[in-house]
Structure formats: C-alpha cells, structure tokens
Amino acid sequence: QILLTQSPAIMSASPGQKVTMTCSASSSVSYMYWYQQKPGSSPRLLIYDTSNLASGVPVRFSGSGSATSYSLTITRMQAEDAATYYCQQWSSYPPMLTFGAGTKLELK
C-alpha cells in the first residue's frame, strides 16, 4: 500500500501570492493527480498525469514532480482558490486508488 503525505496540512496565502503544496509518496508512483474541493461541493480535478491541466482549470495552476515527490503550484493566489486540495495516485498492481489527507488553503 502506498501512503501519500501532504504538507502543509493548513496554509494561508494573500491574493497574488505564489502557493506551493507538496505530496510525498511512500513508494515511487508513475503519476499524480490533484483535486480541489470546496465545502458542499464535489472534488474538482485540477491536474492529471502529474502535470496536465484538466479542462477549464486556470493556467495559474500547475503540477510537477516524479517518483515520490510531487507538488501543486498556484502562481498567483486568488480568493476563489481557498479550498482543500488533495493528491491522488493510481496503482495498477495491485489495483489501488490512494488519496492524501489534504492541504487546506485559506485566504489571508
């Protein structure tokens, strides 16, 4: 089983500030996915296959990383970006879907 550890657990940023959060895997993974969730809403896919932007996601979001170390960056924080962000990986053998515990991003 692969454990995903997200850091920090909670962070705050001012409008216009660059934000970076990380996701560390206990074993090497091929790809990472990132989701944004706001209270009362379903998770929204932001990044797939580590660095590809999902449809309709603003270009201020980007993903990077490899092996056991991955990150999500917001180049310029906006008020609507306040949310909880989750990383997720898919292992084909054995078939397993794993999520991190989340990073809560608050507006400062």
UniProtKB/Swiss-Prot annotation:
Q: Where is this region: Complementarity-determining-2?
A: 49-55
Region annotation (Complementarity-determining-3) ranges: 88-98
Spans annotated as Framework-4? 99-108
- Region (Framework-1), start-end ranges: 1-23
According to the record, the residues making up region (Framework-2) are 34-48
> Where do the record's region annotations for Framework-3 lie?
56-87
What domain of life? Answer: Eukaryota
Give the intrachain disulfide bonds.
23-87
An example of a Gene Ontology BP annotation on this entry? adaptive immune response
Q: Give the UniProt keywords, A-Z.
A: Adaptive immunity, Disulfide bond, Hybridoma, Immunity, Immunoglobulin
Q: Which GO CC annotations does the UniProt entry carry?
A: immunoglobulin complex
Where is the segment annotated Complementarity-determining-1?
24-33
> Which InterPro entries does the record associate with it?
Ig-like_dom, Ig-like_dom_sf, Ig-like_fold, Ig_sub, Ig_V-set, IgV_Light_Chain
Q: Which Gene3D superfamilies match?
A: Immunoglobulins (2.60.40.10)
Which Pfam families did the record assign? V-set
What is the name attached to this protein's record?
Ig kappa chain V-VI region NQ2-6.1
Q: What is the species of this protein?
A: Mus musculus
